[in-house]
Amino acid sequence: GWYLQPDCNMPNGESIIRNISEGHRFFEEEFGVRPTTAINFDSFGHSVGLVQILNQAGYDTYVVCRPAKAQFPFEEQDYLWKGLAGSEVLVHRSDENYNSVYGHVGKELEQFLEDTKDEPVSLYLWGVGDHGGGPSRVDLTDVTKLIKERAAELEIIHSNPEAYFKERKAAKTSYPVVEKSLNPVAEGCYTSQVRVKQKHRLLENEILVGEKMATQAELLYGTKYPKEEIHEAVRALLFSEFHDALPGSGTQQVEEDTL
């Protein structure tokens, strides 16, 4: 439900809110809906300050993949993440990753069903592509076949995260509690490609100052507020916050394109 999957540590709160607002605008214009589940599969850690922002933006659930199980061995894949001022979201961490290998979904799903056989409801993420979600014909055929084969013992449906969380809440009312940032993850990203980080912070501050000055100019002198120009700058800022751009985990070409 966001504009993109950003780094969730370095951007300030205003930037996170801008990201959410752009995502809201897209989903409302294209689909006429406003999601209540936020998804940041691949972000390298998550600041606890996000919880309050998520709540105030209308999200009550969150799907992540990092930090991985080896780094944060939580009791369960679903847990209650508590933030500031009494805020909280129900989080699902997918330990099976967020995408699948072309032509392997049938076998992967069978293993997933075996691993989660004691759960009343579970969430399996599949699809090709950098962040999954791209169903191939061969995998869809295999999944359809498996749905028919296992119909007598369990129900497999194509669905969405909101539906999963609704079923999960109906089946389970208490969860392990986490009251801290989901960090550290990939610590090298905190210092890698520092030029991107410096330019990002500069642009963040310049946009905030520019908005204030433009508002004052309109109120005091009738100068037209440069809405489109500022929006273009905001989109550039959000692009730079992508979780492989701002952290510096991309190639040199990515760094140059971001700059």
Regions found by a protein language model. Name each.
Residues G1-L259:
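Catalytic-domain carbohydrate-binding cleft regions of carbohydrate-active enzymes
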